Amino acid sequence: MKYIVMQDVFFVVLLLVLAVPLGIYMYKVMIGEKVFLSRVLEPVERFGYRLMGVSEVGMSAKRYAVSVLAFSAVGFVFVMAVLMLQGFLPLNPEGMKGLSFSLAFNTAASFVSNTNWQAYSGETALSYFSQSIGLTVQNFVSAATGIAVLFAVIRGFIWKKQKTVGNFWQDLFRVTLYILLPLSLVLALLLVSQGVVQSFADYSVVETLENGAKQLIPLGPAASQIAIKQLGTNGGGFFGANSAFPFENPSSFTNLIEMLAILLIPVALVVMFGRAVKDSKQGRAIMTAMMIVFVIGVVAITISEQFAGPHYQGVATSGSMEGKEVRFGVGGSSLFAASTTAASNGAVNAMHDSLTPLGGLVPMFFMQLGEVIFGGVGSGLYGMIGFIILTVFIAGLLVGRTPEYLGKKIEPYDMKMVCLLILVPPLLTLFGTAVAVMMPSVQASVSASGAHGFSEVLYAFTSMGNNNGSAFAGFAADTTFTNMVGAVMMLLARFIPLVAALYLAQNMAGKSSVAASSGTLSTKNGMFIGLLIGVVVLVGALSFLPALALGPIADFFTTFK
């Protein structure tokens, strides 16, 4: 246990050390200031703008949102076409056939929405072309879209009397060129150096040591996709077993760098936020709130998995190792599970369906908090800003003062947008789960009975409704109902809050700042951090406690039998 504690502390410290300079760098990218890569990348940037016909004219929230939706729609159609027609496309050495309409629809929605829910196994269903040209490209642009929208939201708080929130095409291009591509290149090369596969060769047939039997070894351009899958909080694995597969995550060292990659940009964006609003204490307050909840979750999962459960009381064990890789152990698996669900990533290095009931409850609850404990790149922070405004609003009601945040007064219109930001994911999750448990096809998809069977369904629709993408793998996801309903859920959960965030940003940008007074609520002290955590957890608890009581909580009490 001491080793696990040391590992977790080292991880958090290293994460913060890496995130601070990256956050400062991203702030410079956001405001268009020169960075150390400018000499190399500025000519590429100018050429890209000329090629796409991009002007630097600012956009209103409506125009920005239309640009995001149109761009995403084109990506959706392209990915769906590639998946359905892959049998006729190049780079298909294994002769993979096109996906069914419902599966292609679900997969396209999943990757466009930055969810990366996978109802297929990559090595048996997709060609190299589909993986690299279809899905990997979406991993880049969906992540860049989230960060671009966050840039717009931040401008809403730092600009005064403005009618625009920035230019989507410029933001998208700069995020991709200056942030995601360089980081992904470095990480991909690092992964390849550690043995992660990067090849366009045919699958290999090898003779095993057991009776000379033949075995097919899948290959492919995995490292390049894994790099952006982690950095962009996408999470979709090149192989079916995701980061539990040795070709994706071969050692404890690659496990460390993949976990760092999952949280690096979300944490750095908080640093960037503090820099952008000219008050680092604001960023530190948000970081502290996120980190407190994250650490509590890591501790809860680790203890639950290390001590396995009441039925192992008095038995000497090394923890619950079912569904875990020996090379990672309980500590590496628990930290990964917390990281991937706190950050809206969804990659896994262990089977979450095999976690103990309380161990599985924590990742599920992280998602149900709205993916704001770090959350997805961009979307996590603008979701947390929604919770901050809600917290300020509640505090203002308590003391009878007009609430304000960063010098901008909070008005009824702002609260309407915040409600859309906060309430859409839980409503989609609960409605989807309620409908799903009544469907015979979903009931047949569940591998377990009783409380754990319900947990499998709840986890699946929580994951899709909050753009995470991980799953309790005992749930057979490739059914027409789950594919179609899940796709609609993922798109709505992504784009309704995104559009609401943009309109919130424009309304804030149009206001002038008001000077802080003695009655202004401080949003950077310990009291506010506690209030913020309370509001985030309370909204999650009130929304999901009844469902959790029927699932993982009831499942936990069955272990006393």
From Swiss-Prot:
<keyword id="KW-0633">Potassium transport</keyword>
<keyword id="KW-1133">Transmembrane helix</keyword>
<protein>
    <recommendedName>
        <fullName>Potassium-transporting ATPase potassium-binding subunit</fullName>
    </recommendedName>
</protein>
<comment type="function">
    <text>Part of the high-affinity ATP-driven potassium transport (or Kdp) system, which catalyzes the hydrolysis of ATP coupled with the electrogenic transport of potassium into the cytoplasm. This subunit binds the extracellular potassium ions and delivers the ions to the membrane domain of KdpB through an intramembrane tunnel.</text>
</comment>
<comment type="similarity">
    <text>Belongs to the KdpA family.</text>
</comment>
<keyword id="KW-0630">Potassium</keyword>
<keyword id="KW-0406">Ion transport</keyword>
<feature type="transmembrane region" description="Helical">
    <location>
        <begin position="528"/>
        <end position="548"/>
    </location>
</feature>
<feature type="transmembrane region" description="Helical">
    <location>
        <begin position="133"/>
        <end position="153"/>
    </location>
</feature>
<feature type="transmembrane region" description="Helical">
    <location>
        <begin position="177"/>
        <end position="197"/>
    </location>
</feature>
<feature type="transmembrane region" description="Helical">
    <location>
        <begin position="417"/>
        <end position="437"/>
    </location>
</feature>
<keyword id="KW-0813">Transport</keyword>
<keyword id="KW-1003">Cell membrane</keyword>
<feature type="transmembrane region" description="Helical">
    <location>
        <begin position="484"/>
        <end position="504"/>
    </location>
</feature>
<dbReference type="Pfam" id="PF03814">
    <property type="entry name" value="KdpA"/>
</dbReference>
<keyword id="KW-0472">Membrane</keyword>
<keyword id="KW-0812">Transmembrane</keyword>
<dbReference type="GO" id="GO:0030955">
    <property type="term" value="F:potassium ion binding"/>
</dbReference>
<feature type="transmembrane region" description="Helical">
    <location>
        <begin position="65"/>
        <end position="85"/>
    </location>
</feature>
<feature type="transmembrane region" description="Helical">
    <location>
        <begin position="4"/>
        <end position="24"/>
    </location>
</feature>
<dbReference type="GO" id="GO:0008556">
    <property type="term" value="F:P-type potassium transmembrane transporter activity"/>
</dbReference>
<feature type="transmembrane region" description="Helical">
    <location>
        <begin position="253"/>
        <end position="273"/>
    </location>
</feature>
<dbReference type="InterPro" id="IPR004623">
    <property type="entry name" value="KdpA"/>
</dbReference>
<comment type="subunit">
    <text>The system is composed of three essential subunits: KdpA, KdpB and KdpC.</text>
</comment>
<feature type="transmembrane region" description="Helical">
    <location>
        <begin position="380"/>
        <end position="400"/>
    </location>
</feature>
<dbReference type="GO" id="GO:0005886">
    <property type="term" value="C:plasma membrane"/>
</dbReference>
<feature type="transmembrane region" description="Helical">
    <location>
        <begin position="285"/>
        <end position="305"/>
    </location>
</feature>
